[in-house]
């Protein structure tokens, strides 16, 4: 049973014998690096980098469901990229704008 499933994965059009498997697998490194950056201070976050990560994730999520063969590894890595990019952008926006607004209110008050 396990052998037949493993063989089916190996021979799949988006399996390990193709670029359709390895490209998204290595792309997970970007999402993992973005997750590791959750611990870094928000002032070090780059708007342009996170916008690129977010847009790439969103665009390729759609494309990964249209292409043949369907590549769910590509879809999942791009969902992760979009999610981590949105989270990082949220952290940066809160740091740049919300904390400044709170500081201004405290100064006035």
Curated annotation (Swiss-Prot):
Gene that this sequence comes from: MPC2
Pfam family of the protein (one): MPC
Subcellular location: Mitochondrion inner membrane
InterPro entries: MPC (IPR005336)
Name of this chain's protein: Mitochondrial pyruvate carrier 2
Physiological role: Mediates the uptake of pyruvate into mitochondria.
Residues passing through the membrane, by range: 19-35, 51-67, 74-90
Main location: mitochondrion
Single GO biological process annotation from the record: mitochondrial pyruvate transmembrane transport
Cysteines paired by S-S bonds: none
GO CC aspect terms: mitochondrial inner membrane; mitochondrion
Species the sequence originates in: Arabidopsis thaliana (Mouse-ear cress)
Membrane protein topology class: Multi-pass membrane protein
UniProt keyword annotations, A-Z: Membrane, Mitochondrion, Mitochondrion inner membrane, Transmembrane, Transmembrane helix, Transport
Similarity comment: Belongs to the mitochondrial pyruvate carrier (MPC) (TC 2.A.105) family.
